[in-house]
Design a protein with these regions (language model features):
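Generic detector of short, locally flexible boundary/turn motifs and exposed helical patches
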Residues: 2-3, 41-43, 100-105, 123-128, ...
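Basic/aromatic-rich interaction segments and small domains that mediate binding to polyanionic partners
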Residues: 10, 15-37, 79, 118-133, ...
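Short, solvent-exposed coil/turn linker segments
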Residues: 47, 87, 106-107, 127, ...
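Residue-level preference for alpha-helix termini and adjacent loops
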Residues: 57, 62, 68, 85, ...
Length: 226
């Protein structure tokens, strides 16, 4: 999905100011928003990539004018309505229209539930990787309407495989259908001038984690030269 959340390489937004001794939460409501996301996630109606995709639907002007945890709250509200856990009217009025049809975790169950969260690794689910360290690859020119982890600035670019991180759930399909499709994930090194042109520093490089379906051999027959 080409949205305002994918800001890499865009101009005009000013510097990223690092806050010294930054707290985990700046306001009490942010901690509540974070806890609500975790608690609702334990209901099993969506996964982490669906959560990211929900936040990506925030209108661009609203996205730029709001904070990190406001994005989280927007995505949660959207999912609660989409999954019929609340109605749009209940969200608008902030009043329940009836008893909830879900069973919430008890405080005593929370530590166990957090410990039991499963990692996205699927190393036992796929054969040998298609690429290895040192291989030249080209990212595909993908512009899906659904979720993807391939940033716009790194599409249709040539890089070199630095390492294979292993096999993980492919976020794209996980967000769109919930299917757990295994895919190798590689750290790919892109030279700065490959991404940004002649204005980039000659010693600059960017490492992007790319899933195997995003990549193809750079030296395939008929590929444009680099």
């Amino acid at each position: 999905m080409n949205g305002i959340h994918d800001l890499g390489g865009m101009h005009g937004f000013g510097p990223v100011d690092a806050e010294e001794n930054e707290p985990v939460f700046h306001h009490e409501w942010e901690a509540r928003a974070f806890a609500l996301n975790l608690a609702a996630g334990f209901l099993g109606r969506w996964n982490i990539d669906m959560g990211r995709y929900a936040r990506e639907h925030m209108p661009p002007a609203e996205y730029l004018a709001t904070t990190y945890y406001e994005h989280w709250l927007y995505g949660l509200e959207r999912l609660l309505v989409e999954k019929s856990l609340i109605t749009a009217k209940e969200l608008e009025t902030m009043r329940s229209q009836g008893p909830a049809a879900v069973k919430a975790l008890s405080p005593a169950d929370v530590p166990r539930a957090l410990r039991n969260r499963r990692a996205a690794r699927m190393d036992d689910r796929l054969a040998a990787p298609r690429f290895k360290a040192g291989d030249r690859v080209r990212t595909k020119n993908l512009h899906p309407t659904g979720h993807t982890r391939l940033p716009r600035y790194a599409r249709d670019k040539v890089g070199v495989i630095d390492r294979d991180h292993g096999v993980f759930i492919l976020p794209d399909e996980h967000a769109n259908s919930g299917a757990k499709v295994p895919a190798h994930c590689y750290a790919v090194r892109f030279e700065g001038r490959e991404l940004w042109g002649a204005d980039a520093g000659p010693r600059d490089a960017v490492f992007v984690d790319c899933f195997e379906p995003y990549l193809e051999p750079a030296d395939r027959p008929g590929a444009p030269p680099r």
